[in-house]
Amino acid sequence: MTDADDLRRRTAELLAAHPPATTDRLEFLRARFDAGLAWVHFPQGLGGLDAPRSLQAVVDAELEGTGAPDNDPGRIGIGLGMAAPTILRFGTEEQKQRFLRPLWTGEEVWCQLFSEPGAGSDLAALATRAVREGGAEAGGDWIVDGQKVWTSSAHLARWAILIARTDPDVPKHRGISYFVCDMTDPGVEVRPLRQITGEAEFNEVFLTGVRIPDAHRLGAVGEGWKVAQTTLMNERVAIGGARTPREGGMIGIAAAGWRAHPELRTHDLHQRLLNLWVEAEVARLTGERLRQQLSPTLNSSPTLGSARAGGPPCAGGAPMGQPGPEGSGMKLAFARLAQEISGWEVEFLAEDGLTYDDWTMRRPDGVDFTGREAGYRYLRAKGNSIEGGTSEVLLNIVAERVLGLPPEPRTDKDVAWKDLPR
């Protein structure tokens, strides 16, 4: 049984064998992965030790201050937060061995090819087609044609998680399959989408005759929607449930500005800041509780053969160790707080808060809410209630799958995708 003392010993051995001051960055990250200290809740041989997720903090604390490099999580967040848990749950052993190590070390960046111009909030209506070469029974490669949009990191990515329609003759949720797509395929074209900040974090991706071997399919043919739910639930936890210290993140910046500028204070702004501070702390503690629900290990699904399979559910009905719909609530809280805090900050700083004059076209590796000016935060936060699931859709998920309220009526449940009006 791996405990905190065992992890401290293993970390000390890693540092002794690979001193950060004299070890190449990539060599150190690979050694850390091989030692099971990358994500301790993953299985042995895949960067982990089958330990409780909560013990990752022990490893992080032991490495802090040693000069040990990190894997640049802001740059590879889609791989860490979405692709990795999906591959772990639904991938073959060969897929896990091939993809997880370079994903974690940052050698290979991942992106997500889900949303389409006509399938955003109604993602299951997607139209990108994947057709089996030689027919459904031939066992050949898949040829993919279509368009995806709002794709973060597509301009950096080596791989993409992709959902595409493989059967248009069944209802929309049942005709989808899930693939790993090679972003270097000559049929992949990435175009930047410029945002309100002037940057282009996002992209639109055109797929023309892209060839995907069947060995790069995750899950069974036609069960891609089930696989995608794991990705989406993990995405919302990754966005809304990131660990922050008390008074960290955007609320910390707002509080620091308040302390630094007494001449700008008013009673109304003070009361609003206090309310936002309390709400941010409630959200932080709720995130801690969610992580405790996930803390046993990710090995809680029948796919992984864990003794915990079928164990006690989280609040939203998912097994312990797997995110459930309650993660949607965390993402909702994050989006609302980011917008309200950034709005408060702009109002507090008056004309200085509106200063944002760098409209240079850039392709950043990620979002930097804490290292930029207030005007940037205000503009960028507007997208938080859209990306990763719109707040309106997430409210429906919380209502139906957490609170148990009646679902919205659906008229297309048994209608083949090809017969849906478009």
What are these regions (language model features)?
Residues 106-114, 163:
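A short, Trp-centered hydrophobic/proline-enriched beta-strand micro-motif
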Residues 267, 281-308, 313-366:
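C-terminal helix-coil-helix/basic helical segment that borders enzyme active sites and/or dimer interfaces
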Residues 1-77, 88-90, 98, 102, ...:
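Amphipathic, small/basic residue-rich leader segments at the start of a protein or domain
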Residues 140-141, 145-191:
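A short core secondary-structure module
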Residues 119, 149-154, 196-197, 383-388:
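Glycine-rich phosphate/pyrophosphate-binding beta-alpha loops
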Residues 128-132:
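A structural signal for short hydrophobic beta-strand segments in well-ordered beta-sheet cores
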Residues 188-285, 300-304, 308, 313-319, ...:
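Glycine-rich beta->alpha junctions and the first turn(s) of the following alpha-helix
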Residues 20, 328, 332-422:
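Alpha-helix capping/hinge segments and adjacent helical runs
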